[in-house]
A protein has these predicted regions:
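Short phosphate-engaging motifs
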Residues: 82, 110, 172
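Pseudouridine synthases involved in rRNA/tRNA modification
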Residues: 1-17, 27-28, 136-139, 156-159, ...
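A structural signal for short, hydrophobic beta-strand segments that form beta-sheets
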Residues: 8-11, 62, 147-150
Length: 253
């Protein structure tokens, strides 16, 4: 997947009510800053000018969020009623989301549930970060749970890494990034949660791979192509398969 440009938006699903895009890494969904001209919103407006809704600030209704650094499936509602039906699915926890990631080190357990509560870091210089309960300066930690399933052990630029499937069972800011870091396996390229050490990869290796939203009118079920394959990035070399991606996704349904 190449870096985002104004005219290379990738569409995974489209109906009269919804569009699901494959968001590029290092791309904001929207921005009020005049100098940030390339956003997902501007890509959508360029590709679908006739679908922009003048009654909304950004022109499009984003059903959920993805971090600036995270790529993958993101759902956009094309009208108010569709947005409401998607919002209800998220509120009622009917949505299934699964992410692919490369994490540092070889994860020894084939599966794990990570249940650290996560709060906002109020320490000076770290106020843009989240943290697990018990960290100095951790404010208002809330219960969080993530499932981690090991897919492959391998290496990235010669260093040991593990390819994992991550399923957030709650929806806290930076949850997957914080949880991976908290168990000693930060996401490859995550500068923020690697004590500002991991700066050499070209991107953070976190990708929203699978999204299922069972709205009353239609079932949205998409996969955003896996970017963590050797044909896409020769720095990643898988050595040993632990779980099949296809079988693991089938278990989520």
């Amino acid at each position: 997947m190449e870096p985002g440009t104004i005219d290379n938006l990738s569409i995974l699903y489209q109906s009269s009510d919804f569009i699901v895009v494959n968001k590029h890494w290092d791309l904001r969904i929207d921005s009020k800053m005049w100098y940030e001209t390339l956003t997902l919103q501007s890509q959508l407006k360029y590709r679908f000018p006739e679908l922009a809704d003048p009654d909304t600030y950004y022109g499009f209704r984003f059903c959920h969020q993805l971090d600036f650094s995270t790529s993958g499936a993101l759902c956009v509602a094309l009208n108010k009623a569709a947005a409401g039906s998607a919002y209800k699915c998220f509120k009622d926890r009917l949505v299934t989301k699964a992410y692919l990631a490369l994490v540092r080190g070889h994860v020894s357990q084939s599966r794990m549930t990570i249940s650290y509560a996560i709060g906002k870091n109020t320490t000076e210089g770290m106020t843009h970060m989240m943290c697990i309960e018990g960290t100095e300066g951790c404010e208002n930690p809330k219960p969080c749970q993530s499932e981690l399933i090991v897919l492959e052990h391998g290496s990235y630029s010669g260093d040991p890494v593990t390819k994992v499937l991550l399923q957030p069972l709650t929806g806290r800011t930076h949850q997957l990034r914080v949880h991976c870091s908290s168990v000693g396996h930060p996401i490859v390229g995550d500068f923020t949660y690697s004590h500002k050490q991991d700066s050499s990869p070209y991107r953070m290796m976190l990708h929203a791979y699978y999204l299922r939203i069972p709205t009353g009118k239609e079932l949205i079920e998409v996969r955003a192509p896996d970017p963590f394959v050797t044909s896409m990035d020769g720095n990643w070399l898988p050595h040993h398969v632990v779980h099949s991606l296809e079988e693991t996704i089938q278990e989520l349904k």
